C-alpha cells in the first residue's frame, strides 16, 4: 500500500478570527491522523498551525498501527470558529517514530467532531474537511501507543460485525479478487475451505465430463472467479453439467493458484473429506434466459431492467453509483451539514415551470357492482349504483369551471416534488448548513440522453453564504466524488476505460488537476460569439439565451478544456428565488459545466429580501399563495444563504463515461416508459 502523508492545518475564518489570536493558538497539540480505508497506517507528517496570518510550524512525529482498527475514531475540533482539515504533504513520509504527548492548557474546549474524511481537499472558505483526531491526555511527555486509544473506546463500539449469507464462511468475490497479492496469498494459504455464492456466467465440461468449469459472479466486483468441480465430488454433479449461464450456486472448496492465463486464483471443489461441496440453488432454462448471449445492446437491456443488473455494464454502474452516494454523505457529514429528509409530495413548484406530476385520488369511480357493496359511513346509506356511476369522473366546482380539489385527499392540488430546495431552506435558516439527497420528478416530454422523468438530486443549502462560497463548495464536492471513485472503484473504472471510454481515467484526473475555470455569463457569450463561425452552433448565440448542451460542452471541451463555472446569469432565464444583482439584469446564479455532459450543477445565492422576492414571483407570473411560507422566512431573522442542485445521474455519467442517462439508474422513467 502506498504511503500517504498529510499536513494538519488549524484554520479560522478571516472575517471572524483576529490575527492576534494566532499567538495563543501556538499550542503543542497532538493529533492522531487516520489515513487508510481498511487499516490505520500513520506516517510522520508535518503539523502546521495556520490562521489568517502566516503559517507557523512546530515539530511533529508519527507512528504506525498494524492491522485494521475495529472501532470508530473520536476526533476533536477546536471551538468555533476554528476548525481543522487535512491536505496531502508533498514530502514523502519518514520512518515511524513514537508520538510525544503534550499537556493541553486548561480552558481550551475540545468537543468531539465528525469522523475522518481522509481525502485531499483545498481549504473551503468556512467549510473545511473534518479531521480524524484524538487529543492527548494531559501529563508528562511519553510514548503514545495504540493502547491509549483503545482505553477511550466504549465497549459497545468494539463488537464484531457478523457475516451474512451462505453461512458465516461466505467470501465475497471482491474481497478475494480485488484485494491484491496479499489478499490472494491469505486465501491460498487458508487451512479451512472457502464458500462463495453467485450466478454462472458460463458452464462448460472438460475431460469427457470428469471436470466442470463454472465462471462465477456475485455482483460485488467486475471480476469473475473460475470454479473447477471434479466428478468425484458426487452429489448433483450430473445435473451441474447440464447448467448454463444464469444459474445460481453455492460452492465450498479451496482457493488455489490458477494455471490459466488472466486469473490469479480459482476455486477447487474436489475433496468431500475436506468439506468440499456444491449446491445448485436455482436452475435456468438456457433456451429462454434473456442474457444467454455475451453482448447485448443498451436498448435491449432497458427492456429487461429486472435482469440487466447481471450484465457487466449495469453491475459496474451500480457499484459506482453506490460509492458516489457514500461519497456524497461523507463529504457533507464531514463538514457538519445535517441531512434533511424533504417531502416527495408537495404543493410548491420550485422551478416555476409547471412541469410537475400531479398526485390525486380523484379517479373514476369503481364499477357499479363494487359500489353496490359499499358499507355505510357516518350513518349514510350507500349510494345507488346507477346514480354513482352517473357522477362526473372528477368532481368539479359549483360553477363547473374547475376541479373541486377540496374533495381530493389533501384538500388541495398536490404534486411530486421537482426539487427539495424550497423545503430544505427553512432548515438552513434554523440549523445552518444542511443538505437533502433524494428522488425528484419532472414531467418534461424530453427524449434526450440527458433527461429523465425521475432522477435523484443532491441539494445542499449553506447558511450565511455568498455565491462565492457556493461555487467553492460545489467544486470541492465534484472533485471529492471523482477522487473517491478513483480510490474506491478502481477495478470498475478500469473496466469502463476498456469497454466504454478510452482515456476515462486521464479525463477524471484532469478534473482534479487544476481549479475549475470561472467565467461570467456575459464573458461566456462573448467567447461563444467569437467561436461561432468555427463551431457552427445549431442555435445562434446571443445575450439572454439559455445556453444549450452544445454551447456548454464547447466551453469545457474546446475553450477551457476542463470544467468551468459560469455565473451571473440573466434574471429572465433563471428561477424566481435567485438574488438579484446590483445591475438589475442578472442574478447571482452559477452553473458548473463539465466535458461530455454540459451542466452538472446549478445553484445560486437565494434572495433574502422579502419585497424583492415578492417582486420576482410577480414578474414570473406565479401565484404567490403557495409560496406564502417561503416569503415569511424573510420576515423572521432572514439571512444570506446559498445552495445548489446536482443531478446525481449526470454525476454517474461523468465518472463512468456512460453516454445515456437511462443506463445510470436502476429503473429509468422517461416518456412512454414506466415498466417494472
Predicted regions and their residues:
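N-terminal chloroplast transit peptides
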Residues: 1-109
Amino acid at each position: 500500500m502506498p504511503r500517504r502523508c498529510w499536513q494538519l492545518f488549524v484554520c479560522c475564518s478571516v472575517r471572524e478570527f483576529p490575527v492576534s489570536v494566532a499567538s495563543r493558538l501556538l499550542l503543542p497539540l497532538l493529533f492522531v491522523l487516520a489515513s487508510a480505508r481498511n487499516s490505520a497506517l500513520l506516517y510522520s507528517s508535518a503539523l502546521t498551525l495556520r490562521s489568517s496570518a502566516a503559517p507557523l510550524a512546530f515539530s511533529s512525529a508519527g507512528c504506525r498501527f498494524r492491522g485494521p482498527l475495529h472501532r470508530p475514531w473520536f476526533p476533536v475540533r477546536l471551538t468555533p470558529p476554528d476548525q481543522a482539515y487535512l491536505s496531502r504533504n508533498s514530502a514523502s513520509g519518514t520512518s515511524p517514530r513514537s508520538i510525544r504527548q503534550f499537556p493541553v492548557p486548561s480552558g481550551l474546549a475540545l468537543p468531539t467532531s465528525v469522523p475522518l474524511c481522509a481525502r485531499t481537499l483545498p481549504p473551503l472558505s468556512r467549510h473545511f474537511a473534518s479531521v480524524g483526531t484524538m487529543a492527548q491526555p494531559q501529563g508528562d511527555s511519553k510514548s503514545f501507543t495504540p493502547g491509549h486509544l483503545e482505553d477511550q473506546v466504549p465497549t459497545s463500539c468494539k463488537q464484531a460485525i457478523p457475516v451474512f449469507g451462505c453461512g458465516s464462511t461466505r467470501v465475497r468475490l471482491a474481497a478475494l479478487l480485488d484485494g491484491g497479492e496479499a489478499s490472494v496469498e491469505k486465501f491460498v494459504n487458508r487451512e479451512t475451505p472457502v464458500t462463495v455464492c453467485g450466478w454462472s456466467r458460463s458452464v462448460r465440461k472438460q475431460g469427457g465430463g470428469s471436470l466442470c468449469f463454472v465462471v462465477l459472479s456475485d455482483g460485488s466486483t467486475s471480476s469473475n472467479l473460475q470454479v473447477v468441480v471434479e466428478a468425484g465430488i458426487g452429489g448433483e454433479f450430473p445435473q451441474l453439467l447440464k447448467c448454463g449461464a444464469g444459474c445460481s450456486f453455492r460452492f465450498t472448496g479451496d482457493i488455489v493458484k490458477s494455471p490459466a492465463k488472466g486469473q490469479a486464483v480459482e476455486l477447487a471443489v474436489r475433496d468431500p473429506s475436506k468439506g468440499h461441496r456444491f449446491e445448485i440453488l436455482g436452475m435456468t432454462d438456457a433456451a429462454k434466459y434473456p442474457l444467454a448471449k455475451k453482448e447485448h445492446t443498451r436498448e435491449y437491456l432497458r427492456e429487461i431492467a429486472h435482469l440487466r443488473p447481471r450484465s457487466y455494464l449495469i453491475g459496474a454502474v451500480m457499484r459506482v453509483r453506490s460509492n458516489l452516494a457514500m461519497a456524497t454523505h461523507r463529504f457533507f457529514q464531514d463538514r457538519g451539514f445535517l441531512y434533511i429528509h424533504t417531502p416527495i409530495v408537495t404543493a410548491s413548484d420550485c422551478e416555476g415551470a409547471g412541469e410537475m406530476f400531479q398526485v390525486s385520488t380523484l379517479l373514476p369511480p369503481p364499477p357499479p357492482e363494487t359500489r353496490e357493496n359499499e358499507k355505510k359511513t357516518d350513518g349514510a346509506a350507500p349510494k345507488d349504483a346507477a346514480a354513482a356511476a352517473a357522477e362526473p369522473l372528477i368532481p368539479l366546482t359549483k360553477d363547473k369551471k374547475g376541479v373541486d380539489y377540496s374533495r381530493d385527499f389533501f384538500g388541495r392540488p398536490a404534486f411530486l416534488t421537482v426539487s427539495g430546495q424550497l423545503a430544505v431552506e427553512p432548515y438552513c435558516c434554523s440549523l445552518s448548513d444542511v443538505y437533502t439527497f433524494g428522488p425528484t420528478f419532472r414531467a418534461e416530454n424530453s427524449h434526450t440522453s440527458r433527461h429523465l422523468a425521475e432522477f435523484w438530486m443532491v441539494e445542499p443549502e449553506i447558511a450565511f453564504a455568498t455565491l462565492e462560497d457556493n461555487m467553492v463548495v460545489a467544486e470541492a464536492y465534484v472533485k471529492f466524488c471523482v477522487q473517491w471513485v478513483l480510490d474506491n472503484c478502481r477495478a470498475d473504472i478500469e473496466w469502463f476505460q476498456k469497454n466504454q471510454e478510452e482515456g476515462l481515467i486521464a479525463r477524471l484526473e484532469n478534473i482534479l488537476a487544476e481549479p475549475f475555470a470561472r467565467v461570467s455569463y456575459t464573458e461566456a457569450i462573448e467567447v461563444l460569439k467569437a467561436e461561432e463561425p468555427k463551431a457552427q452552433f445549431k442555435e445562434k448565440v446571443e445575450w439572454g439565451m439559455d445556453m444549450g448542451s452544445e454551447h456548454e460542452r464547447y466551453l469545457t471541451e474546446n475553450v477551457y478544456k476542463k470544467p468551468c463555472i459560469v455565473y451571473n446569469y440573466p434574471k429572465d432565464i433563471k428561477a424566481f428565488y435567485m438574488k438579484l444583482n446590483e445591475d438589475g439584469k442578472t442574478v447571482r446564479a452559477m452553473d458548473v459545466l463539465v466535458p461530455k455532459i454540459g451542466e452538472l450543477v446549478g445553484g445560486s445565492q437565494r434572495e433574502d429580501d422579502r419585497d424583492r422576492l415578492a417582486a420576482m414571483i410577480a414578474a414570473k407570473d406565479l401565484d404567490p399563495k403557495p409560496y406564502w411560507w417561503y416569503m415569511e422566512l424573510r420576515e423572521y431573522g432572514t439571512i444570506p444563504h446559498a445552495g445548489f442542485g446536482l443531478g446525481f445521474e449526470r454525476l454517474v455519467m461523468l465518472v463512468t463515461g456512460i453516454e445515456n442517462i437511462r443506463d445510470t439508474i436502476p429503473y429509468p422513467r422517461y416518456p412512454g416508459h414506466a415498466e417494472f
